[in-house]
From Swiss-Prot:
The chain crosses the membrane at residues 34-54, 75-95, 101-121, 134-154, 173-193, 317-337, 364-384, 441-461, 465-485, 548-568, 591-611, 968-988, 1026-1046, 1090-1110, 1112-1132, 1204-1224, 1227-1247. MK 571 inhibits sphingosine 1-phosphate and leukotriene C4 export. It comes from the Eukaryota. Residues 325-608, 975-1256 form the ABC transmembrane type-1 domain. This is Multidrug resistance-associated protein 1. Its main location: membrane. Residues 1-33, 96-100, 155-172, 338-363, 462-464, 569-590, 989-1025, 1111, 1225-1226 are extracellular. The modification Phosphotyrosine is found at residue 277. It holds the Pfam family ABC_membrane.
Length: 1531
């Protein structure tokens, strides 16, 4: 009554009247309702939003937008609207001034509306000043205002059409103006303003259109349509992709996570300290003795470690990403509430159909409400999904960035516990787990909320009978809990097996050359398959568990429905199961099905993420290197004249291990050249590592003054151009760069490289020789122009004359670095007289230290060492360097032979690629060369010289053959059985629901329904058949998935191992690791799940359409066109989605390749202090990967919104046709039809998601199969051509007009080789760098097949027999000593062919018996990844032991004694002479003195044999061999 007086002066205008607004065929709102509610609703909305929006804008200032026509128009219209509203107000005052009695509403409403319009105008300007280009708040306000005005407009038009209507002309005119202006404001709000001034998007060449998209465009994801169209017309390329939004980049995301993690770690340490302190001072109990107190204190201190609080990574992730992610809570809650509107409207619709007297407009209203509700649900749901996916993407970016940064600083002991495989898995699999969790995590609270709301509405519908359903759900809880615990256990075991497999695959890929040379592929294949078998066992258990889980989860909603209906109809005969109760309940049960089905997935995802969270926390908590353990001072700082000062320092590789270096004390003055010498394993390399802070300093003081450069023993080369390897991130200074190139003897190499210094160097420098890699590594250090240089045997891998050149021009007293402090680890004695100080290492300690003369004078171990090894066998020694022997007191020391033992460790790869077609002839030229000349023009066919092949993305639709391949991998029987069981399950589901509709239409006789028991029994039986078929298809798909995983992995492994070496040189290891980790994980885990969900969604959609057509045949007019629209949109989407997935996969490989490369060279990166640059590179590669991922997730949303709109249309037409045909339809069929249509949207959404997931995930199968089509090497064994088991008996090797090239389009690197090597001959092979020495051995092992001619061993053409038949009969001691993780025995004898006694004998002959006997586990001692727990020299001795064990008739030594000290080298040479006395020995030598007693020497130059004969004869000829011997100081 109060509102009557408010709305009209005489109280005659009611606020609400049912007969006017509801119970009529032509409804309308009352005048009072129009003037109050319809005016106030938009005002209340804006005023409620204003304080929150104002606060948000004040905190999020994006910049200032200049006034535009759009902004000016909106502002002007705002003022006009304010004037129009207040014109109404002044008109009311004017009326009152004329004595007209007006209701208060005519003053209040215009005033409120006018002030609201001023507020709207103020917000338009505030948004402009804060850089808001399009406002959702304002668009919603204008939309609400328009909808309210629309209702008033309809009423005014209806009133105007009445003959006797009273018309208020002024207010009607102002209203029409108001309506028009609001409509214009709404239209203008749909457009976006220009970007703010100084916005980054202005300068971005290809900015993401999202940032400048309008609100409507963002809500409907319309802004990505341009990319979708481009992708539909032609395959997308990486250049088509937009830049990432700034807030999604690594630069923004990673530092925040790292900062929060450091805070959390510091916090946990502080809390730990508090706990420790509190435990030390316990309160003394009354009456207790002091002894009791002390005992209690001891107990507390002992228990303290149990109370250690680990830093919480979950808290850190929440703190970093929580604020943005919390928005998803709001959208999810809104969606969940809207979801229950459907069943309630369905209830009203069924009641409407039953009430034949109800006006038709009510049915249309319910239909419109269903449609609007469904559309809003769609928009809200996909905003929720978008936030979740973006959060997941940011988490993945942050995790990868944090792992990479941590990998650069963890200690060496920590690196042993986290292998490369594990760290790669952290970046690929574990980071992906967090992404997956982001989409599911909200279901933790959402699923229970949905269950509670559903049960509440079911209670209202069916009463206490619902408790039966609740009981069923409660019974399932412990079962789900047990399965979750089991799932976690299996997940941990699975990840452990996967880590081990990836670790082993990494080693295989890094050491593939050695595997091929030794014919060990099968042994390592079996090792990988054994680990894989364990992995598949766990997967199989998980699959069985998943099948049981699927059975319970699918059956639970049906059992809930069955038990509820059964109790409802049996407890009271008067309980009638009519259409309203049954189908509203069924709709609610269907809603209930989703949270119950999704919860197991959520639990599984949480379990997986918790495992990953723990793994990541452990890795990020590893100890870090302490650069502060070494005092670093700038050069300008005084602090004495010493560059390096070490006082009583002790170092260890791990705190738990005994010290590696102890009692180290020395000082090195600025500008000194210091040599470090000693036997293998004495701690020379460790000393350099200690100075680089790579080791733990236990005690002592270390001070370094100035910057440091480091040349490691094994050269680390990046997959980049030669120039970039040398510049190493520094600016090009042309003159200095040329000087470095010349000094490091690289000019001749550049002249033969196809593009000079721009030539691409393969991964790990595969296309450079060991010497070339070492020189590039040296040039990198020299170019950086540091104050202190640490050289770890840099002259080891180069020829004597090149070593001499480098020492003279770079390291020595007259070299480029003569004023720098240089610390040189060396085995060569020829340079020792020229150094300032010599440090002699023995057993991790400095045994002697002093100048060359001082050490000789002391007549200690060093002098004895020199006497033994400095007097060569050649009496006619020439002193090229003019070095004179120095006499020690009372003794005469013979003159040194310059360069007698100049060679050491070679680079990691045996393979020469382009370099072997060249020669290094004569002295290094000293002419000036410009960088333009250094960049030699490549051949016309650029691809001929392109070595590394980037991971390529396939284009176009995934071929049907890929699906067929996967089905064959599963097994055709299991494939078709799965489809049949799926079909049976969904037929049973459809029949059960149709049966329910028939039941609800049963006539009611005397207040009850007949045949209730039969109906219930059949309904139950159909449900049981559903359960059986569900279990059947889950089991079939899971087992089939495991079969497929096994077969695809075996095929991939077999194909990769059967690939020739050229394949591994062209293919970055990141690509291969990607296949064995991420792609295989997709096949293992994702594809079986996607198949189940895809098949389920497909049959659900077909079933829903069948039911709708059955209920309303008229729907056949609409469903086919909607189906066509659906199909077109889906195909339109898949064209882009598929390509985006491929681009994402391709851009993922460089992330892993760069990461692997970084791990291999981490000590070099740290030494040069280049961590920041490498972090930036890693971030850039991750961002490139996310540039492809982000559009793919948005494209998913784009598709879902459009397809759900198609689904919403099905809801609209199903309800509409039910209203139209209500007089001829039963309530049961209407209920069935509409309840199914309500599910269609969800089914369609899932079908499209799963079909696209299917296509995008099947790409993994495509990428695994990709390598089956690559070129393969010759068969390993050819039974019909197998040589006799005793072959070769003599060891005679003949080269007949032999020629070799590395690739078809390259020149020959060996030409017209004609030579016969008789059995038992000892032949040395020498030549300048790149002459083709190693190429000859590669040809002998058929690593590269001959281009012309043939090789005959004991009358058998080696090209005719199997590769393994050949390779097991020849033994090589390679340039690069490669060991694999596993026992020492496995590294010697992987096939377990020899007895322990034979193994020990080989170790004794290789001078390793004492060392191995001293190990805790002897032969079973575990070797670290890459054999890193042995020195390079010890690894080389293990390779010698392998050769001794195999004892074949032909032995090849490829610079095999490079990494050992002089004494060990002497022992090895004598071992080879005695143990291989009756064998044919081919030795590639840098140290010419080792082959001077050989039968013959072959001199190669430019791939041809230039000289051949006995060493003494060749010396007399004074040709190439003579000049090389002269360089080595042998003549």
């Amino acid at each position: 009554m109060a509102l009557r007086g408010f709305c009209s002066a005489d109280g005659s205008d009611p606020f609400w009247e049912w007969d006017v607004s509801w119970n009529t065929s032509n409804p309308d709102f009352t005048k009072c309702f129009q003037n109050t509610v319809l005016v106030w609703v938009p005002c209340c909305y804006l005023w409620l939003c204003f304080p929150f929006y104002f606060l948000y804008l004040s905190r999020h200032d994006r910049g200032y937008i200049q006034m535009t026509y759009l902004n000016k128009t909106k502002t002007a219209l705002g003022f006009v609207l304010w004037i129009v509203c207040w014109a109404d107000l002044f008109y009311s005052f004017w009326e009152r001034s004329w004595g007209k009695i007006l209701a208060p509403v005519f003053l209040v409403s215009p005033t409120l509306l006018g002030i609201t319009m001023l507020l709207a105008t103020f917000l338009i300007q505030l948004e402009r000043r804060k850089g808001v280009q399009s406002s959702g708040i304002m668009l919603t306000f204008w939309l609400i205002a328009l909808l309210c005005a629309l209702a008033i407009l309809r009423s005014k038009i209806m009133t105007a059409l009445k003959e006797d209507a009273e018309i208020d002309v002024f207010r009607d005119v102002t209203f029409y103006i108001y309506f028009s202006l609001v409509l214009i404001q709404l239209v203008l709000s749909c457009f976006s303003d220009r970007p703010p001034l100084f916005s980054e998007t202005i300068h971005d060449l290809n900015p993401c259109p999202e940032s400048s998209a309008s609100f409507l465009s963002r809500v409907t994801f319309w802004w990505i349509t341009g990319l979708m169209v481009r992708g539909y017309r032609q395959p997308l390329e990486s250049t088509d992709l937009w830049s990432l939004n700034k807030e999604d980049t690594s630069e923004q995301v990673v530092p925040v996570l790292v900062k929060n993690w450091k805070k959390e770690c510091a916090k946990s340490k502080r809390q730990q300290r508090k706990i420790t302190y509190s435990s030390k001072d316990p309160a003394k109990p009354k009456g207790g003795s002091q002894v009791d107190v002390n005992e209690e204190a001891e107990v507390l201190i002992v228990k303290t470690p149990q109370k250690e609080r680990e830093p919480s990574l979950f808290k850190v992730l929440y703190k970093t990403f929580g604020p943005y992610f919390l928005m998803s809570f709001l959208f999810k809650a809104l969606h969940d509430l809207m979801m229950f509107a459907g069943p309630e409207i369905l209830k009203l619709l069924i009641n409407f159909v039953n009430d034949k007297k109800a006006p038709d407009w009510q049915g249309y209203l319910y239909t419109a409400l269903l449609f609007i509700c469904a559309c809003l649900q769609t928009l809200v749901l996909h905003q929720y999904f978008h936030i979740c996916f973006v959060s997941g993407m940011r988490i993945k970016t942050a995790v990868i960035g944090a792992v990479y940064r941590k990998a650069l600083v963890i200690t060496n002991s920590a690196r042993k516990s986290s292998t490369v495989g594990e760290i790669v898995n952290l970046m690929s699999v574990d980071a992906q787990r967090f992404m997956d969790l982001a989409t599911y995590i909200n279901m933790i609270w959402s699923a229970p909320l949905q269950v509670i709301l559903a049960l509440y509405l079911l209670w209202l519908n069916l009463g206490p009978s619902v408790l039966a359903g609740v009981a069923v759900m409660i019974l399932m809880v412990p079962l789900n809990a047990v399965m979750a615990m089991k799932t976690k256990t299996y997940q941990v075991a699975h990840m452990k097996s996967k880590d081990n497999r990836i670790k082993l695959m990494n080693e295989i890929l890094n050491g593939i050359k050695v595997l091929k040379l030794y014919a060990w592929e099968l042994a390592f294949k079996d090792k990988v398959l054994a680990i894989r078998q364990e992995e598949l066992k766990v997967l199989k258990k998980s699959a069985y568990l998943a099948a049981v889980g699927t059975f319970t989860w699918v059956c639970t909603p049906f059992l809930v429905a069955l038990s509820t209906f059964a109790v409802y109809v049996t407890v009271d005969k008067n309980n009638i199961l009519d259409a309203q109760k049954a189908f509203v309940s069924l709709a609610l049960f269907n809603i209930l099905r989703f949270p119950l089905n999704i919860l197991p997935m959520v639990i599984s995802s949480i379990v997986q993420a918790s495992v990953s969270l723990k793994r990541l926390r452990i890795f990020l908590s590893h100890e870090e290197l302490e650069p502060d353990s070494i005092e670093r001072r700038p050069v300008k700082d005084g602090g004495g004249a010493n560059s390096i000062t070490v006082k009583n320092a002790t170092f260890t590789w791990a705190r738990s291990d005994p010290p590696t270096l102890s009692g180290i004390t020395f000082s090195i003055p600025e500008g000194s050249l210091v040599a470090v010498v000693g036997q293998v394993g004495c701690g020379k390399s460790s000393l350099l590592s200690a100075l680089l802070a790579e080791m733990d300093k236990v005690e002592g003081h270390v001070a370094i003054k100035g910057s440091v450069a480091y040349v490691p023993q094994q050269a680390w080369i990046q997959n980049d151009s030669l120039r970039e390897n040398i510049l190493f991130g520094r600016q090009l200074q042309e003159r200095y760069y040329k000087a470095v190139i010349e000094a490091c003897a690289l000019l001749p190499d550049l002249e033969i490289l196809p593009s000079g210094d721009r030539t691409e160097i393969g991964e790990k420098g595969v296309n450079l020789s060991g010497g070339q890699k070492q020189r590039v590594s040296l040039a990198r250090a020299v170019y950086c122009d540091s104050d202190i240089y640490l050289f770890d045997d840099p002259l080891s891998a180069v020829d004597a004359h090149v070593g001499k050149h480098i020492f003279e021009n770079v390291i020595g007293p007259k070299g480029m670095l003569k004023n720098k402090t240089r610390l040189l680890v060396t085995h060569s004695i020829s340079y020792l007289p020229q150094v300032d100080v010599i440090i002699v290492m023995t057993g991790g300690k400095i045994s002697e230290m002093g100048s060359y003369q001082e050490l000789l004078a002391r007549d200690g171990a060093f002098a004895e060492f020199l006497r033994t090894y400095a007097s060569g066998d050649q009496e006619q020694a020439e002193q090229d360097d003019g070095l004179t022997g120095v006499s020690s007191p009372g003794k005469e020391v013979k003159q040194m032979e310059n360069g007698m033992l100049v060679t050491d460790v070679a680079g990691k790869q045996l393979q020469r690629q382009l370099s072997n077609s060249s020669s290094y002839s004569g002295d290094v030229s000293r002419h000036h060369t410009s960088t333009a000349e250094l960049q030699k023009a490549g051949p016309k066919n650029e691809d001929a010289w392109k070595l590394v092949e980037a991971d390529k993305a396939q284009t176009g639709q995934v071929k049907l053959s890929v699906y067929w391949d996967y089905m064959k991998a599963i097994g055709l029987f299991i494939s078709f059985l799965s489809i049949f069981l799926f079909l049976c399950n969904h037929v049973a589901s459809l029949v059960s629901n149709y049966w329910l509709s028939l039941w609800t239409d049963d006539p009611i006789v005397n207040g009850t329904q007949e045949h209730t028991k039969i109906r219930l029994s059949v309904y139950g039986a159909l449900g049981i058949s559903q359960g059986i078929t569900v279990f059947g298809y889950s089991m079939a798909v899971s087992i089939g998935g495991i079969f497929a995983s096994r077969r695809l992995h075996v095929d991939l492994l077999q194909n990769v191992l059967r690939s020739p070496m050229s394949f591994f040189e062209r293919t970055p290891s990141g690509n291969l690791v990607n296949r064995f980790s991420k792609e295989l994980d997709t096949v293992d885990s994702m594809i079986p799940q996607v198949i189940k969900m895809f098949m389920g969604s497909l049959f659900n959609v077909i079933g829903a359409c069948i039911i709708i057509l059955l209920a309303t045949p008229i729907a056949s007019i609409i469903i086919p066109p909607l189906g066509l629209i659906y199909f077109f949109v889906q195909r339109f989407y898949v064209a882009s989605s598929r390509q985006l997935k491929r681009l994402e996969s391709v851009s993922r490989s460089p992330v892993y390749s760069h990461f692997n490369e970084t791990l291999l060279g981490v000590s070099v990166i740290r030494a040069f202090e280049e961590q920041e640059r490498f972090i930036r590179q890693s971030d850039l590669k991750v961002d490139e990967n996310q540039k492809a991922y982000y559009p793919s997730i948005v494209a998913n949303r784009w598709l879902a919104v459009r397809l759900e709109c198609v689904g919403n249309c099905i809801v609209l037409f199903a309800a509409l046709f039910s209203v139209i045909s209500r007089h001829s339809l039963s309530a049961g069929l209407v209920g069935l039809s509409v309840s199914y249509s309500l599910q269609v949207t969800t089914y369609l959404n899932w079908l499209v998601r799963m079909s696209s997931e299917m296509e995008t995930n099947i790409v993994a199968v495509e990428r695994l199969k990709e390598y089956s089509e690559t070129e393969k090497e010759a068969p390993w064994q050819i039974q019909e051509m197998a040589p006799p088991s005793t072959w070769p008996q003599v060891g005679r090797v003949e080269f007949r007009d032999y020629g070799l090239r590395y690739r078809e389009n390259l020149d020959l690197v060996l030409k017209h080789i004609n030579i016969t090597i008789n059995g038992g001959e000892k032949v040395g092979i020498v030549g300048r760098t790149g002459a083709g020495k190693s190429s000859l051995t590669l040809g002998l092992f058929r690593i590269n097949e001959s281009a012309e001619g043939e090789i005959i061993i004991d009358d058998i053409n080696i090209a005719k027999i199997g590769l393994h038949d050949l390779r097991v009969k020849i033994t090589i001691i390679p340039q690069d000593p490669v060991l694999f993780s596993g026992s020492l025995r496995m590294n010697l004898d992987p096939f377990s062919q020899y007895s322990d006694e034979e193994v020990w004998t080989s170790l004794e002959l290789a001078h390793l018996k004492d060392f191995v006997s001293g190990l805790p586990d002897k032969l079973n001692q575990e070797c670290a990844e890459g054999g890193e727990n042995l020195s390079v020299g010890q690894r080389q001795l293990v390779c010698l032991a392998r050769a001794l064990l195999r004892k074949t008739k032909i032995l090849v030594l490829d610079e095999a004694t490079a990494a050992v000290d002089l004494e060990t080298d002497d022992l090895i040479q004598s071992t080879i002479r005695t143990q291989f006395d009756d064998c044919t020995v081919l030795t590639i030598a840098h140290r010419l003195n080792t082959i001077m007693d050989y039968t013959r020497v072959i001199v190669l130059d430019k791939g041809e044999i230039r000289e051949c004969g006995q060493p003494s004869d060749l010396l007399q000829q004074r040709g190439l061999f003579y000049s090389m011997a002269k360089d080595a100081g042998l003549v």
